[in-house]
Amino acid sequence: MQGRLSAWLVKHGLIHRSLGFDYQGIETLQIKSEDWHSIAVILYVYGYNYLRSQCAYDVAPGGLLASVYHLTRIEYGVDQPEEVCIKVFVSRRNPRIPSVFWVWKSVDFQERESYDMLGISYDNHPRLKRILMPESWIGWPLRKDYVAPNFYEIQDAH
């Protein structure tokens, strides 16, 4: 079943794949990495002016990585704002996605966390560096194929 936004994107010749609806009835779309920045700008102009959240996950060991964006169209006088979920899948060998920082500034720390934990590089992000782990940390801790390094914690140090 095609949702309202998917129908609008088809009407305007914008390539995407409908993934259906989640349990709350929110339309979910898959966008190719190379198309994401231009479609993000179009969605902003269309009225999706609020980025509720961005997260990322490892789909399967050795498989794809996904960056997920939850967008909301907030308008005055509307009790139930329109929401959409966008998923961008990338290869773990070269996980690069255009940053949407210049569209929604609120994605700043969220893209940095996705970079820090999964190694997804967000092109044109102004401050893409580790945010939770030390800069010297090797690897991407939330990848399913990540092997934790051997280290010993000093217990009861006073």
Swiss-Prot record:
Its EC number is 7.1.1.-. Its main location: plastid. GO terms for molecular function: NADH dehydrogenase (ubiquinone) activity; quinone binding. GO terms for cellular component: chloroplast thylakoid membrane. GO terms for biological process: photosynthesis, light reaction. InterPro entries: NADH_DH_suC (IPR010218), NADH_quin_OxRdtase_su_C/D-like (IPR037232), NADH_UbQ_OxRdtase_30kDa_su (IPR001268), NADH_UbQ_OxRdtase_CS (IPR020396). Pfam families: Complex1_30kDa. It comes from the Eukaryota. Gene3D superfamilies: NADH:ubiquinone oxidoreductase, 30kDa subunit (3.30.460.80). Belongs to the complex I 30 kDa subunit family. NDH shuttles electrons from NAD(P)H:plastoquinone, via FMN and iron-sulfur (Fe-S) centers, to quinones in the photosynthetic chain and possibly in a chloroplast respiratory chain. The immediate electron acceptor for the enzyme in this species is believed to be plastoquinone. Couples the redox reaction to proton translocation, and thus conserves the redox energy in a proton gradient. PANTHER family: NADH DEHYDROGENASE [UBIQUINONE] IRON-SULFUR PROTEIN 3, MITOCHONDRIAL (PTHR10884:SF14), NADH DEHYDROGENASE UBIQUINONE IRON-SULFUR PROTEIN 3 (PTHR10884). This is NAD(P)H-quinone oxidoreductase subunit J, chloroplastic. It comes from Coffea arabica (Arabian coffee).
